[in-house]
Curated annotation (Swiss-Prot):
It holds the Pfam family ThiC-associated. Its cofactor is [4Fe-4S] cluster. Homodimer. It catalyses: 5-amino-1-(5-phospho-beta-D-ribosyl)imidazole + S-adenosyl-L-methionine = 4-amino-2-methyl-5-(phosphooxymethyl)pyrimidine + CO + 5'-deoxyadenosine + formate + L-methionine + 3 H(+). This is Phosphomethylpyrimidine synthase. Residues 1-21 are annotated as: Disordered. The keyword Lipid metabolism does not apply. PANTHER family: PHOSPHOMETHYLPYRIMIDINE SYNTHASE, CHLOROPLASTIC (PTHR30557:SF1), THIAMINE BIOSYNTHESIS PROTEIN THIC (PTHR30557). It comes from the Bacteria.
Length: 627
C-alpha cells in the first residue's frame, strides 16, 4: 500500500501488491460447512508427478492452513478503501441477541468522528456498531456453556482439520510420530462439538468481536494448532496509517494468526479503523496505550472513567482481544526493585507508576468486574497482561513474575464467572531449563486457560538475532502447552521493524509453532514434512520450494549457485554436487536391489560389496592398474 501522506486516504489508498500475489503452484480453496455462508479458506499446493526413475506416481496436493484471507484469492477484488467483505453478520443477526446502535457511544469516538480535520485520513465507510441487548451475553464462551455450537465453532473445526480425512485417504500421512503432549487432550479429529467443549471449559478462545464481521474465525488453545501473533503499530517517531495496513497484509500473508496493533503515536483511532476493516484475522490492542495518549503521557492522570470510555471506543470498532494489565498490584511493585532490568512491560510500568503516585490499588484490578460487563457485551476476549514479566534471564521466574501470575489466575476465574473468554500472557526472557516451570505454573494457576508468550528469549547476548534466541524458547514452550506465540523480529530491543523484519519474525515463529505441533503429535502435523521430504528425495525442486514456509527465499538460495532452469530437474544440489549426493547414492542402491531381486537394502549393499570384491580379485588383486 503506497500513498502520499498529503492525499485523502479514502480516495487514494492502494493495497500492497506484494501481499496479494498468489503463492506459486497454490490455489485458494473453500471447504463448505453446514450452511452456505460457512466457507472455510485453505491453501492447496499442487505437486509434480514423481519422475519415472522413481516410479512415476501422481502426488496428491497438500492442503495447508491459510491466514492470508481474500488477499491471495485472484477471484476477489481487493479495495482497502472499502475494507474486506462481510463474513459473520448473518450469523450474529440470526442469534437475535444484539442490536445496532444509532452511532458511536464512546465520547472519544464521537469527538473523532465529528472532527473535520481528520476527514482526509478517516476510513470512509464507518458503520454503526452493534452491542448485546440488555441482560444478554454474546460471548462464544456463553454460547458454548449453553451447549450451542455456533457457526464460528463449526468454522474453526473445519479449519483446524485442514481436510485431514482426505489427506489420509491420499496416503499423505503414512508416517507420523506419536509425540509427547504433556497431558494435553488432543483428539484424532477436531469436531465442532470438541471446539464447543474446549471453549466452554475455558481451555480455548475464539476471539471474535461482534463488530469485526470481516473476521475469518480461528481458535487459540493447547489442544489445537499452535498459533502465532505479529505486532504492528505506529509510534511518535514514525510510520503512517498506510504503512501499518501494509504491514498487516504482509504479516498475514506469511502466517500471522492474529495481529496486535500497538500504536502509540498520532491518530491511533483512525489507524485502528483502517486495520480492522481490512483484517481477516483477530486484532488485539493494549487499551492503556491509547488512554495514556489521551492524558498526554502522564500516567498519574489516568482515570477509570477515561479508560472505560477507551474500552468502549475500541470494542465498538471491533477489537477482538484486549491486553489488560490488571495483575500489576501495588504490593508486587517493590518486588521488582532488585531486578536487573526492573519492569520492562510498557503497560506494567504505566500501571505501576499510577499505583505508586496515588498509593492506591490498580484501578484495572478494582474495576475488573465492570470490565467484564463491557467485554461480554461485544465478545471481546481478555489477554491478561504480564506487566511484571522478566526483561532479562537474570530476572526469570522471580517472586514478582509468579505473584502476578497467581493474580491472573484469580482474575481468570472472575472472567469465566461472567462467561468472558480469557487467555494469559507470559514471558519474556527465560533460560531453557526454566521454561517448563513457567508452563506448569501457568496451567496450575490459570486452570488451563490458553497461554500466550513473547518468546521466551533464552539468552540476552544476541541483539539483532533475538528472533532466533526467542524462537528457541517459543518452540519449547509451544511443545509444553503454550497456545499462542508472540513473534519477535530481528529489530527487538533495537528499533521498529520494517516489512523484511516482519516476514523474518513470522517465518521464525511459524517454524517454532510447527515444530511444537510435531512434538505434541498434533493430528496431521507431519503431512507437509512428509510431502517435502518425498519431494527432496525425488529431486522435485519446485515442489520443495513450494511446500516450504517461504518459497521465494528457498528458490533464491538454490538459484544463487545453480541458476539455470535445468538445475531444477537435476539429481543433485550445489552442496554435494553430482558425485557425492547421499540421496542419489541411496537411489542407486535401491536400483541395484531391484535389478538383482533383493528386497533388503542392507543385503543389496552387502551384495554390491561382494560383487566389487570379486572384480578386484579377478583383476589380480592389483591396487593400481596401468590404463
Amino acid at each position: 500500500m503506497s500513498v502520499q501522506s498529503n492525499k485523502n486516504l479514502s480516495e487514494s489508498a492502494q493495497v500492497d501488491q506484494q501481499s496479494i500475489q498468489p503463492f506459486p503452484r497454490s490455489q485458494k480453496i473453500y471447504v463448505q460447512g453446514s450452511r452456505p455462508d460457512i466457507r472455510v479458506p485453505m491453501r492447496e499446493i499442487s505437486l509434480d508427478v514423481t519422475p519415472t526413475d522413481f516410479g512415476g506416481e501422481i502426488n496428491a496436493p497438500v492442503t495447508v492452513y491459510d491466514t492470508s484471507g481474500p488477499y491471495t484469492d485472484p477471484n476477489v477484488t481487493i479495495d482497502v478503501r472499502k475494507g474486506l467483505a462481510d463474513v459473520r453478520s448473518a450469523w450474529i443477526e440470526d442469534r437475535g441477541d444484539t442490536e445496532k446502535l444509532p452511532g458511536l457511544t464512546s465520547e472519544f469516538g464521537q469527538r473523532r468522528l465529528n472532527d473535520a480535520e481528520l476527514s482526509a485520513m478517516r476510513f470512509a465507510h464507518v458503520r454503526n456498531p452493534r452491542r448485546a441487548k440488555a441482560e444478554h451475553n454474546v460471548s462464544q464462551m456463553h454460547y458454548a456453556k449453553k451447549g450451542i455450537i455456533t457457526p464460528e465453532m463449526e468454522y474453526v473445526a473445519i479449519r483446524e482439520n485442514m481436510k485431514l480425512a482426505e489427506a489420509r485417504e491420499a496416503g499423505l500421512l503414512v508416517e507420523q510420530h506419536a509425540g509427547q503432549s504433556f497431558g494435553a487432550a488432543i483428539p484424532k479429529e477436531i469436531t465442532p462439538e470438541f471446539v464447543r467443549s474446549e471453549v466452554a471449559r475455558g481451555r480455548a478462545i475464539i476471539p471474535a468481536n461482534i463488530n469485526h464481521t470481516e473476521l475469518e474465525p480461528m481458535i487459540i488453545g493447547r489442544n489445537f494448532l499452535v498459533k502465532i501473533n505479529g505486532n504492528i503499530g505506529n509510534s511518535a517517531l514514525g510510520s503512517s496509517i498506510e504503512e501499518e495496513v501494509a504491514k498487516l497484509t504482509w504479516g498475514i500473508r506469511w502466517g500471522s494468526d492474529t495481529v496486535m496493533d500497538l500504536s502509540t503515536g498520532k491518530h491511533i483511532h483512525e489507524t485502528r479503523e483502517w486495520i480492522i476493516r481490512n483484517s481477516p484475522v483477530p486484532i488485539g490492542t493494549v487499551p492503556i496505550y491509547q488512554a495514556l495518549e489521551k492524558v498526554n503521557g502522564v500516567a498519574e492522570d489516568l482515570t477509570w472513567e477515561l479508560f472505560r470510555d477507551t474500552l468502549i471506543e475500541q470494542a465498538e470498532q471491533g477489537v477482538d482481544y484486549f491486553t489488560i494489565h490488571a495483575g500489576v498490584l501495588l504490593r508486587y511493585v517493590p518486588l521488582t526493585a532488585k531486578r536487573v532490568t526492573g519492569i520492562v512491560s510498557r503497560g506494567g510500568s504505566i500501571m505501576a507508576k499510577w499505583c505508586l503516585a496515588h498509593h492506591k490499588e490498580n484501578f484495572l484490578y478494582t474495576h475488573f468486574e465492570e470490565i467484564c460487563e463491557i467485554m461480554k457485551a461485544y465478545d471481546v476476549s481478555f489477554s491478561l497482561g504480564d506487566g511484571l514479566r522478566p526483561g532479562s534471564i537474570a530476572d526469570a521466574n522471580d517472586a514478582a513474575q509468579f505473584g502476578e501470575l497467581e493474580t491472573l489466575g484469580e482474575l481468570t476465574k472472575i472472567a469465566w464467572k461472567h462467561d468472558v473468554q480469557c487467555m494469559i500472557e507470559g514471558p519474556g526472557h527465560v533460560p531453557m531449563h526454566m521454561i517448563k516451570e513457567n508452563m506448569d505454573k501457568q496451567l496450575e494457576c490459570c486452570d488451563e486457560a490458553p497461554f500466550y508468550t513473547l518468546g521466551p528469549l533464552t539468552t540476552d547476548i544476541a541483539p539483532g538475532y533475538d528472533h532466533i534466541t526467542s524462537g528457541i524458547g517459543a518452540a519449547m514452550i509451544g511443545w509444553f502447552g503454550c497456545a499462542m506465540l508472540c513473534y519477535v523480529t530481528p529489530k527487538e530491543h533495537l528499533g521498529l521493524p520494517n516489512k523484511d523484519d516482519v516476514k523474518t519474525g513470522i517465518i521464525t515463529y511459524k517454524i517454532a509453532a510447527h515444530a511444537a505441533d510435531l512434538a505434541k503429535g498434533h493430528p496431521g502435523a507431519q503431512i507437509r514434512d512428509n510431502a517435502l521430504s518425498k519431494a527432496r528425495f525425488e529431486f522435485r525442486w519446485e515442489d520443495q520450494f513450494n511446500l516450504g514456509l517461504d518459497p521465494d527465499t528457498a528458490r533464491a538460495f538454490h538459484d544463487e549457485t545453480l541458476p539455470k532452469e535445468s538445475a531444477k530437474v537435476a539429481h543433485f544440489c550445489s552442496m554435494c554436487g553430482p558425485k557425492f549426493c547421499s540421496m542419489k547414492i541411496t537411489q542407486e542402491v535401491r536400483e541395484y536391489a531391484a535389478e538383482h531381486g533383493l528386497t533388503d537394502e542392507q543385503k543389496a549393499i552387502e551384495a554390491g560389496f561382494a560383487e566389487q570384491s570379486s572384480r578386484f580379485k579377478d583383476g589380480g588383486s592389483v591396487i593400481y592398474k596401468q590404463v
